[in-house]
């Protein structure tokens, strides 16, 4: 991240949907970057735990949150989410919403599954291999893999989006997003 003001603070449609689907509670924003989802949720009354490996990204988020008068609803941690042993632990039944947008680290899925409280939401938006291409990159899922995994958990899919981003399609990627609710 550059040290300038964060750009692109518009949340993904899946986050916008989730914020209106349940009453505000405690949210976990994994790999929050410069905080577009953290700030969006905090402005809507959520208490947000924001985690990212970049101190620069966290600092940009905090400055923007201060300017938007929602800093008091944000806890932040500079932690490597891929570290072994884990630098940040997702507490079981600890969150009303967990967001994982454009950060794929497969070992987190189990912790996400059990970290969402009953009745709570998982918001996932991840890159997937484009039609007809295989999954050669470790940060890309196969098409339908995210939805299939969450359905295997027994969760209800409330929102689903498949987006072929023509800019990313050149790289053989598109995006899939969902909002899923853990059974109460």
Describe each PLM feature range:
Residues 1-22:
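S-adenosyl-L-methionine
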Residues 25-33:
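Conserved class I S-adenosyl-L-methionine
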Residues 47-52:
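Conserved SAM-binding motif I beta-strand of class I
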Residues 54-56:
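Conserved SAM/SAH-binding beta-strand->alpha-helix loop
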Residues 70-83:
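Conserved SAM-binding strand-loop segment of SAM-dependent methyltransferases
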Residues 87-97:
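A short acidic, Gly/Pro-enriched loop at the edge of an enzyme's catalytic core
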Residues 109-120:
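A short glycine-rich, Lys/Arg-flanked "PGG" loop and its adjoining helix->strand segment in the class I
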Residues 120-129:
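Conserved beta-strand signature within the Rossmann-like core of class I S-adenosyl-L-methionine
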């Amino acid at each position: 991240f550059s040290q300038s003001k964060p750009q692109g603070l518009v949340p993904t449609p899946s986050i916008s949907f989730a914020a209106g689907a349940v009453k505000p509670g405690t949210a976990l924003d994994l790999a929050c970057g410069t905080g577009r989802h953290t700030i969006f949720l905090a402005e809507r009354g959520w208490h947000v735990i924001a985690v990212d490996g970049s101190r620069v990204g966290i600092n940009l988020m905090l400055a923007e949150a201060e300017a938007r008068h929602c800093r008091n609803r944000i806890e932040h941690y500079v932690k490597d989410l891929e570290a072994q042993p884990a630098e940040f632990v997702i507490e079981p039944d600890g969150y009303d919403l967990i967001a994982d947008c454009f950060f794929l680290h497969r070992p987190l899925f189990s912790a996400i599954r059990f970290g969402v409280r009953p009745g709570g939401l998982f918001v996932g938006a991840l890159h997937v291999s484009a039609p007809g291409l295989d999954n050669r990159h470790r940060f890309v899922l196969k098409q339908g893999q995210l939805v299939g995994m969450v359905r295997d958990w027994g969760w209800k899919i409330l929102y689903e989006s498949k987006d072929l981003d023509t800019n990313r399609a050149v790289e053989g990627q598109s995006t899939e997003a969902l909002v899923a609710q853990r059974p109460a």
